[in-house]
Amino acid sequence: MRIHLVAVGHKPPRWVRDGHETYAQRLGKGWRLELHEVGAGGRGNDDPQAREREGERLLRALPSRAVCVALDEGGTPRDTRQWARSLERWSHEGGEVAFIIGGADGLSDAVRQRADACWSLSPLTLPHMLVRVLVAEQVYRAWTLLSGHPYHRS
């Protein structure tokens, strides 16, 4: 199962790289978590043009055959078991999924329209760099649930 994390922003802080790599390396045989970074659209406060530029870059970075899940505070809330069930289903259907993380100004309409699903990690607004670590941990947690590993405790 190939899981792509397609995210806005280059050069994340060390704690973000370390967190992402920690969980990516823990995944068991047959599961890979790959990071694809795209450049930010510019600097500005809620700049719609910057969001559109980021959206174009995100869309170009998406693997063509992957199920695409946009991550957005307005998306559908999903608990850990729902993450695990979805990943399990997608692994049986072809084994590729892309989680899309926008930049500081969120996701463009084009990205939302391309997405097969839109999920929320929290009703809180989260820093996009922190979301990378949260997604990596949830992917690992889902794998442990599906593998019978004792990491997840209900």
From Swiss-Prot:
Subcellular localization: Cytoplasm
Binding positions (S-adenosyl-L-methionine): G102, L121, S122, P123, L124, T125, L126
EC number, as in UniProt: 2.1.1.177
A Gene Ontology term for the protein's cellular component: cytoplasm
Keywords: Cytoplasm, Methyltransferase, rRNA processing, S-adenosyl-L-methionine, Transferase
Record's keyword annotation contains Protein transport: no
InterPro entries found in the cross-reference section: Alpha/beta_knot_MTases (IPR029028), RlmH-like (IPR003742), tRNA_m1G_MTases_N (IPR029026)
Catalytic function, reaction form: pseudouridine(1915) in 23S rRNA + S-adenosyl-L-methionine = N(3)-methylpseudouridine(1915) in 23S rRNA + S-adenosyl-L-homocysteine + H(+)
GO molecular function, one term: rRNA (pseudouridine-N3-)-methyltransferase activity
Transport in keyword set: no
Broad class of enzyme this protein falls into: transferase
Gene3D superfamilies: 3.40.1280.10
Pfam families assigned to the protein according to its UniProt record, in alphabetical order: SPOUT_MTase
Family statement drawn from the similarity comment of this UniProt entry: Belongs to the RNA methyltransferase RlmH family.
Its job: Specifically methylates the pseudouridine at position 1915 (m3Psi1915) in 23S rRNA.
Assembly and oligomerization: Homodimer.
HAMAP family on file: 23SrRNA_methyltr_H
Protein name: Ribosomal RNA large subunit methyltransferase H
Protein source organism: Halorhodospira halophila (strain DSM 244 / SL1)
This protein's encoding gene: rlmH
